[in-house]
């Protein structure tokens, strides 16, 4: 299930999935998940979380899913806000992936997707147009 789940020992699967579904993300649904990983992080532990389902690829804004997950974590588990707990060495990689430190710094202030959404989406349509010639399907 790589890239389909978000789980941790301290998450309540029902509350987490309900919170994420309450955001009304178009083309995306979340279902509660209870698993016991047999390798990697939390190996052998009973953990809970969500599984992500894409219901409409044309409407889903896939690049925002992780931001909504971080928002839900901050709302349900304020002592676990993602950037508050992250190793600061990891901030640089996040900033590189996002193109600047603006996303991280702004999101950290509010823990709300709405605070970064316009900035995050500002070049999306231009990118879609420029990249069309490289699509294989």
Model-derived features with residue positions:
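Flexible, low-complexity junctional segments that flank or bridge functional domains
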Residues: 121, 125-135
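Conserved functional hotspot residues or short segments at active or partner-binding sites
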Residues: 2, 6-119
């Amino acid at each position: 299930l790589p890239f389909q789940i978000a789980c941790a020992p301290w998450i309540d699967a029902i509350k987490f999935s309900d919170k994420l579904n309450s955001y009304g993300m178009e083309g995306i649904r979340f279902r509660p998940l209870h698993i016991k990983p047999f390798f990697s992080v939390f190996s052998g532990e009973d953990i809970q979380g969500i599984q992500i389902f894409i219901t409409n690829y044309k409407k889903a804004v896939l690049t925002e899913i992780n931001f909504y997950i971080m928002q839900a974590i901050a709302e349900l588990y304020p002592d676990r806000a993602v950037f508050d707990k992250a190793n600061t060495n990891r901030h640089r990689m996040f900033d590189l992936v996002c193109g600047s430190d603006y996303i991280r710094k702004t999101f950290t202030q509010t823990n709300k997707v709405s605070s970064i959404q316009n900035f995050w989406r500002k070049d999306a349509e231009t990118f879609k147009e420029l990249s069309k010639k490289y699509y294989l399907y």
